[in-house]
């Protein structure tokens, strides 16, 4: 039963993890907007989510946990996703080699924040739906 519950929530969980990781990358781009030579980076969300979901199906990302007591419940933990960072090609490169376009970064940052909130709402809706089913006894 827990396997089915985990599978039902896994997609949203992985999407949230990748969105949070992308938010950090975009924040780093914004923070380094005035750093000479800084290369703007980003994550291809769709392809990275596919990779993470496939890796989970292959069960190659499972890490064994050590039980310190025989009364503990055996479990497995997934390794956190580490997305491949890609460099952005600038529309107008600056003279100092910095490729951060603040308008693009702000737009991407706001869009990613909105997508994160939508994923969180979808996950919350899934959990509420499951709770309703459990409480109704069906």
UniProtKB/Swiss-Prot annotation:
Organism: Escherichia coli (strain K12)
Pfam family, one: Flg_bb_rod
Protein name, per record: Flagellar basal body rod protein FlgB
Keyword entries, A-Z: Bacterial flagellum
Disruption outcome: Strongly repressed swarming and swimming.
GO biological process, one term: chemotaxis
UniProt similarity note: Belongs to the flagella basal body rod proteins family.
Gene Ontology cellular component terms for the protein in this record: bacterial-type flagellum; bacterial-type flagellum basal body, rod
Subunit structure: The basal body constitutes a major portion of the flagellar organelle and consists of a number of rings mounted on a central rod. In Gram-negative bacteria, at least four rings, L, P, S and M are present, whereas Gram-positive bacteria lack the L and P rings. The rod consists of about 26 subunits of FlgG in the distal portion, and FlgB, FlgC and FlgF build up the proximal portion of the rod with about 6 subunits each.
InterPro entries for the chain: Flag_bb_rod_N, Flagellar_basal_body_rod_CS, FlgB
Function: Structural component of flagellum, the bacterial motility apparatus. Part of the rod structure of flagellar basal body.
């Amino acid at each position: 039963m827990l396997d089915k519950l985990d599978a039902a929530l896994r997609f949203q969980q992985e999407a949230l993890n990748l969105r949070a990781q992308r938010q950090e990358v975009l924040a780093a781009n914004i923070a380094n907007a005035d750093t000479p030579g800084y290369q703007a980076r980003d994550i291809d969300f769709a392809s990275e989510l596919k990779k993470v979901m496939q890796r989970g199906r292959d069960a190659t990302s499972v890490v064994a946990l050590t039980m310190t007591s025989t009364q503990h419940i055996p479990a497995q933990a997934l390794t956190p996703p580490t997305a491949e960072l890609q460099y952005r090609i600038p529309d107008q490169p600056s003279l100092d080699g910095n490729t951060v376009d603040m308008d693009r970064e702000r737009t991407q940052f706001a869009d990613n924040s909105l997508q994160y909130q939508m994923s969180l709402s979808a996950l919350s809706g899934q959990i509420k739906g499951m709770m309703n089913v459990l409480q109704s006894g069906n």
